[in-house]
Amino acid sequence: MSSSTPTKGRVLVADDDPAILRLVTTILEKEGFAVVGARDGREAYKALQDNSNFTAAVFDVVMPHITGPELLRYMRTEKRFNKIPVMMMTAEQDPKLSSDSFAAGAVVFLPKPFTTTQLQTMLRMLVGKAISQS
């Protein structure tokens, strides 16, 4: 897990693909956010238990141990997490995954592969939603 001094807030990022985790982390840090990275759903769940002070979250849909939608459903049942905006990402081509993600409470869904520009746009939308809720 990585962490830096927050300026705009803290974002939890969970993806089992190290390259995607690094890319999302780098973009968010350049935007002024502190990032807590998790390599799978279990690490993300632990990060949520250890610190409820997140501005936003980005989850891969398909991860070992606990999936992105499972994490999101857990967050929506906990008062301390239920307002945190979440973006879901996946390389899976099943259109049901996006509808399931939105049904679980995601505010943004990004299919992989994506361009850096697409990712930046979606992350700005996500953190903009987080800032407007605070």
Which ranges hold each PLM region?
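Receiver (REC) domain active-site loop signature in two-component systems and cognate sites
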Residues: 63
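C-terminal output helix
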Residues: 114-123
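Acidic, metal-coordinating helix/loop segments flanking the phosphotransfer/catalytic sites
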Residues: 37-56
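Short, glycine/charged-rich "phosphate-handling" switch motifs in NTP-dependent
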Residues: 107
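Charged docking surfaces used in two-component/phosphorelay signaling
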Residues: 22-30
